[in-house]
């Protein structure tokens, strides 16, 4: 069973989604199925079929969440320190071409959200950053071509 690294915040988010799906969404869907079933003929009952599909999707996600939570390797980034980049680090970079600063936190695959500044540990930029420190230069082969960055800051917590 492969462990799935994630931050404490990511782990708590998955647990909250699981709780919501089991305790709120599941009963709502069961009620919708019962209501649609009461309308009679199920063969042409669009509400019934939509509710059954929603149930299938919800149960699939519940199974996925249970698996992720069981395999979670929770890393409390508030207890990490150091001046090199590793899982959980928040890194400030400067693009060598545009001189634009970017800030990213390196997180697990399930909690990555580039718009929020959280990048997956398995992303090209995170892989290039692991083990680097302030002042180091990295080159990332991205879909738009190679980009160069300099590490300005490495923070934890």
From Swiss-Prot:
InterPro entries: GreA/GreB_C_sf, TF_GreA/GreB_CS, Tscrpt_elong_fac_GreA, Tscrpt_elong_fac_GreA/B, Tscrpt_elong_fac_GreA/B_C, Tscrpt_elong_fac_GreA/B_fam, Tscrpt_elong_fac_GreA/B_N, Tscrpt_elong_fac_GreA/B_N_sf
GO biological process terms, semicolon-separated: DNA-templated transcription elongation; regulation of DNA-templated transcription elongation
Coiled-coil stretches noted in the UniProt entry, renumbered to this chain: none
Pfam family, one: GreA_GreB_N
Matches recorded under SUPFAM superfamilies: FKBP-like (SSF54534), GreA transcript cleavage protein, N-terminal domain (SSF46557)
Keywords, ordered alphabetically: DNA-binding, Transcription, Transcription regulation
NCBIfam families for this protein: greA, PRK00226.1-2, PRK00226.1-4, PRK00226.1-5
Physiological role: Necessary for efficient RNA polymerase transcription elongation past template-encoded arresting sites. The arresting sites in DNA have the property of trapping a certain fraction of elongating RNA polymerases that pass through, resulting in locked ternary complexes. Cleavage of the nascent transcript by cleavage factors such as GreA or GreB allows the resumption of elongation from the new 3'terminus. GreA releases sequences of 2 to 3 nucleotides.
Family per record: Belongs to the GreA/GreB family.
Identification of the protein by name: Transcription elongation factor GreA
Origin species: Chelativorans sp. (strain BNC1)
Gene that this sequence comes from: greA
